[in-house]
A protein has these predicted regions:
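Hydrophobic alpha-helix feature that most strongly marks membrane-spanning transmembrane helices
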Residues: 70, 74, 124-127, 134-137, ...
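Structural signal for membrane-spanning alpha-helices in multi-pass inner-membrane proteins
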Residues: 18-23, 128, 189, 193-196
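Hydrophobic, glycine- and aromatic-enriched re-entrant/interface helices and adjoining loop segments
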Residues: 6-111, 139
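Generic alpha-helical transmembrane segments of integral inner-membrane proteins
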Residues: 8-16, 115, 119-123, 187, ...
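Hydrophobic transmembrane alpha-helices and their immediate junctions
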Residues: 111-155
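Transmembrane helix-bundle signature of multi-pass membrane transporters/permeases
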Residues: 104-107, 147-151, 179
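Structural signal for the C-terminal ends of transmembrane alpha-helices
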Residues: 1-5, 123-133, 193-200
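A juxtamembrane structural motif centered on a specific transmembrane helix
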Residues: 154-203
Length: 203
């Protein structure tokens, strides 16, 4: 991609995003009146912009998640730590095995464990893109590239939420978060990617 295309897209997306956020945070937002935005979604955006005002409400889990990841330091507190101050044992995060599983990983396995998870997810996504580049036909390339893009996008959003870089979205961490529908969908997608790769070898 050329820089002209990249800057052109940014020139359109950034102002639109700023306008959307400005409309979303208004008390009587037109986005809520039109049904484009739900009230709980507005609260999530507000809690991201003003965490101190929502520290006991919508921002509670994200703030505790950041604390948990930081408390793991380099090596972590150990697998299934019994410390009452941990996010699991202290119930500081509701259902940590779902959207906020990375907070538990950061706390129990530290920076090293967190980096390992990120690298593994990145390797899976890169392998999908590699299969897409070698695919025999366009449909196979789209399937493999789509799965790679999905894993990268979903991982980025989830990690952004857990580290409070992004507002809470409810997206799971691929292959790790608890959730039958998410896991089955991802495994089915990876099965398609493996099939595309098999077709490449046969060709």
């Amino acid at each position: 991609l050329s820089y002209k295309v990249i800057f052109g897209v940014l020139a359109v997306v950034v102002p639109c995003l700023l306008i959307f956020i400005n409309l979303a945070v208004q008390p009587d937002s037109i986005l809520i009146e039109k049904g484009i935005l739900k009230s709980y979604q507005q609260n999530r955006i507000l809690s991201f912009l003003y965490p101190d005002e929502y520290e006991d409400k919508e921002a509670y889990q994200q703030l505790n998640s950041v604390t948990a990841i930081g408390s793991g330091q380099l090596d972590g507190k150990g697998y299934k730590t019994n410390e009452i101050s941990s996010v699991k044992n202290g119930n500081y995060i509701l259902e940590p095995q779902t959207d906020f599983i990375f907070a538990v990983i950061g706390e129990e396995f530290g920076f090293k464990g967190s980096c390992t998870v990120v690298v593994l997810l990145l390797l899976i996504a890169l392998e999908c893109l590699s299969v897409a580049a070698k695919a025999k036909d366009l449909s196979g390339a789209i399937i493999a590239a789509g799965m790679g893009g999905l894993i990268i996008f979903q991982s980025f959003i989830n990690l952004g939420v857990v580290t409070f870089i992004l507002p809470n979205t409810g997206l799971t961490l691929p292959f790790i978060s608890y959730g039958l529908t998410s896991l089955v969908s991802l495994y089915m997608g990876m099965g398609f990617v493996l099939n595309v790769r098999l077709q490449c070898k046969r060709g």
